[in-house]
């Protein structure tokens, strides 16, 4: 790929040093400010809790570094808007890590949808099921803390919303959200006692979409859980006037023409995955995304084809904010459009 990791920073310097030793990273810092100011750094990858994203991103952009920011982009749309404004003013590459866009199966799915293979979209359904945080004895961490941006809605719901927007080329106009916290306390590693969990571990979401070239009166639903046992699922379904498309965690893509009553496979090229990464859609998507980022940086471009920009991150954040407001009011909420 022709890229080199030249520096790593962590609040836990000992961990950073261990990673640096394993992968031959020359510069180690206990403060991210050293990293974003380093002369050899071209791209800053922000993989810290969401509450820290805005400060790190703004500083990196001030140093004219390209930025790849983990999702959710920020704690709220106000913070995200500031990040967009700064990125636009500096004119550098600024992306959100929505790597699922780079899976071959999803790219083929989007191409088929846009070519009219299933007609006008009527409904979308997204299912994410994992027991990643299903064990109550798992220690309290930032994922358990609302103030730090933890929770299933931000971590997984952001991917769901981005998938809807990118796949349909439409905006979310209205939402209804129900967030739940099933494991309400977790062990504190410092005190040994139990600490309150202030974030959601399940989300049930409904959506309405704007009309566009592929949508007319379209609706959507999502079921997200990180405390559900059983088979791990990351499944996206789109139902149209002429048929349906479905992509699964495995990368398999299926089509069901209206009236057929069955799914049939769609041939998709296998995704490549970097050595040493854990098997899964996230790793396969990120491998392709990373290659595209490096190619753009080498070419001096400030965009990456198909990648989620800071503007996309802001749009997703508007939807997440509306979903949280809906959960509080138990009512449908309109998403801010500007």
Q: What do these predicted regions represent?
A:
Residues 1-23:
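N-terminal Rossmann-like dinucleotide-binding module
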Residues 11, 247, 277-291, 308:
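Active-site loop of classical SDR/Rossmann-like NAD(P)-dependent oxidoreductases
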Residues 12, 23-86:
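Beta-loop-alpha module in the N-terminal Rossmann-like domain of NAD(P)-dependent dehydrogenases
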Residues 25-26, 63-65, 90-92, 214-218:
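A short helix->loop->beta-strand "cap" motif at the edges of active sites that frequently abuts
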Residues 43-46, 81, 292-338:
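C-terminal helix-rich "cap/oligomerization" subdomain common to oxidoreductases
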Residues 82-100, 119-126:
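Rossmann-fold dehydrogenase core element
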Residues 100-197, 330:
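Predominantly a Rossmann-like dinucleotide-binding segment in NAD(P)-dependent oxidoreductases
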Residues 162-254, 290-298, 302:
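Contiguous beta-strand/loop segments that form the cofactor/metal-binding neighborhood of enzyme cores
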